Amino acid sequence: AEFLQQNPERQVIVEGYTDSTGSANYNQRLSERRADSVRMALLSRGISPERVATRGYGKEYPVASNGTSSGRAMNRRVEVTISNDAKPVAPRSSVSG
């Protein structure tokens, strides 16, 4: 939050993820709640709501195998991306590659 306070032109996207345990609907809502929790923490530290976008992806985009407990733990995460300028950060689903 301190970096964002010192760089008021920067935009942020907070993206939440889950492991593969549970239903798709449950995981989607959980990933959204994770992202929203980080957003609320940033807002409570004085970051303007217009600067912080959120997105939940459920079990999509795992970074590790969901076949192990350590892999599932790694997949339960939130990623915060800060823009290099005043333009909004594109959500993961719109980035090609």
List where the protein language model places each region.
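Short, solvent-exposed mixed-charge patches
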Residues: 95-97
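Periplasmic OmpA-like peptidoglycan-binding domain that tethers envelope proteins to the cell wall
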Residues: 7-10, 15-92
